[in-house]
């Protein structure tokens, strides 16, 4: 579910509002499809575009948030913030798809093509976090 648009980006939810045991797989599958589609678009263009995707997996606070006059279903919490930080790191690593250690673990053998970028300092976090790149 595309939950909201944020400037030139968007927040997509997998496993909310309905629980999905394979949410990490769904998110990575969608990301790979977007990258594939971008490759086809760029092949037919003189102005190639790049996208950056960050995927994290974990618990969130989900529900209708807002005033009584305008409520909006959304998710908040550290998981959302961390995914946003991952997305922003794509510029630093010249990458397009970064995932957290939690996503890598949830993928199991389906994440065997993940390349470790090591423990990376993340803005707003005291300890460096293990980051993985997918192609």
Task: Please provide the spans of the model-predicted regions.
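Active-site loop/short helix in cyclic nucleotide turnover domains
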Residues: 14-18, 59-67
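Alpha-helical scaffold within the catalytic cores of cyclic-nucleotide enzymes
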Residues: 16-53, 78-89, 112-113
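Helical mechanochemical/support elements of P-loop NTPase systems and associated helical scaffolds
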Residues: 6, 23, 30, 57, ...
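Catalytic NTP-binding/metal-coordinating core of nucleotidyl cyclase/transferase enzymes
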Residues: 1-29, 73, 91
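Acidic/histidine metal-binding catalytic segments
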Residues: 6-7, 45-54, 96-101
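Cytosolic regulatory/linker segments at or just downstream of nucleotide-handling modules
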Residues: 60-62, 83, 89-135
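A structural signal for short, well-ordered beta-strand segments
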Residues: 10, 51-57, 131
